[in-house]
Amino acid sequence: MNRQRFNDLTALYPRLRIAIVGDFCLDRYLEIDPAREETSLETGLPVFNVVNVRSQPGAAGTILNNLVALGIGEIFPVGFCGDDGEGFELRRALQARAGVKLDYFLQTGERRTFTYCKPLVVEPGREPVELNRLDSKNWTPTPASVQDHLIKSVRALAENADAIILMDQVDVAETGVVTAKLLAAIAEIAAKRPSLLIIADSRRGLKGYPAVTFKMNAAELSALTGAAEKLTTEEIELLARSVARRHGRAVFVTLAERGLLGAMPTGQVAHVPALPLRGPIDIVGAGDSVTANLTCALAAGASLRESLEMAAIASSVVIHQLGTTGVATVADISAFV
C-alpha cells in the first residue's frame, strides 16, 4: 500500500459511524514514588505513597481509545457502568473523548463498574514496574432488564452504523454485556443487513457466536477448531480459510511475532509479517489496536491486505508505548507506510 492510498482511506475516517458493543472498564493507574515509602505504625508493613492517579477507559474502552485516536467521526459505546464513583470516572473519561456519543451507554445500580486498578512504581530514568493488579468485576448474571436495554440500543444503531465491534472481556459467561441473548439479536441483525461489518473478539473464544467477522489469536483459533495448540503459519492459514468459508465471513488471526493473517470466504488469504522491534515493548493493548484498525480500514473500503498492513503497523506503534495501554494515530501509522 502506498502513501496516497493510505491517505485516501484514512480521509474517510471522520465520516464513519462505529458502535462498540461490549465490556467497558475503568483502567486506573496509581503511580507510586518508592522514594516516599513509609512504614505503617498499625501493621508494620510498607506504605506505598501514590503521587499521581490517572484513569482511562479500558477493555472495550481500549478499542474506543484507538477509534478516537484514528479520528472516527461518531463512536457509540454500548455497554454499562455502575452507579458508583468508578462509573462516574468512566463516563467522564468517555465523554471527554472526541466523537464519543453516550446516548446508548447505560449507567445502572444493578451492576458495578468493571475496574482494573494498576499500581505502578515510577522512578526517574527507569521503566515503570506494575505491581499486583486489583480488579473489581461482576460475578452474577447480567439482569434481564439490562440485557434488554442493551439489545434495544444495538438494534437502533444497526440501522445506520458503518460497523459494529463486539468485545467480550469478562471471564464468567453471562455476567457482562455480550450474553447469549444479545448474540441472538446480533445474528438477526447480521441476517437482516448482511453488508454491515460486524467484527467479534472474545477472551473466552468465539465458539457459539453467529456468523460475523471473527478476530482471534492463534490459541483461540486452535480452541475454536479443535486443532493442536501449536500451529505453523501454513496450518493457521488452512484453518482460517476453512472457518471463513463455513461462516461466510472474514477471519483475522493475530500471530504475535509472526504478524497478522486474514482469510476471506472466497478462499483469499493474506499474511502480513510483524514489524521489527525498535526497543522495549509492552504487548498490552496490541490486540485491541488490531481490532480497531481492521474495523476502520474495512469500513473505509480497504482490501484484505491493506487492512492487515494498517493493523500491523498500528500494533507495532502500540507495543512500544510503555506504562500505559497505548493507541496509534493516523500520523503514527503514516510514518511507517
Residue ranges of model-derived segments:
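Ribokinase/PfkB-type carbohydrate-kinase core domain
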Residues: 1-38, 42, 49-281, 300-304, ...
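Short glycine/threonine-rich catalytic loop with a Thr-x-Gly-x-Asp
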Residues: 276-294
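Solvent-exposed, amphipathic alpha-helical segments
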Residues: 289-297, 301, 314-321
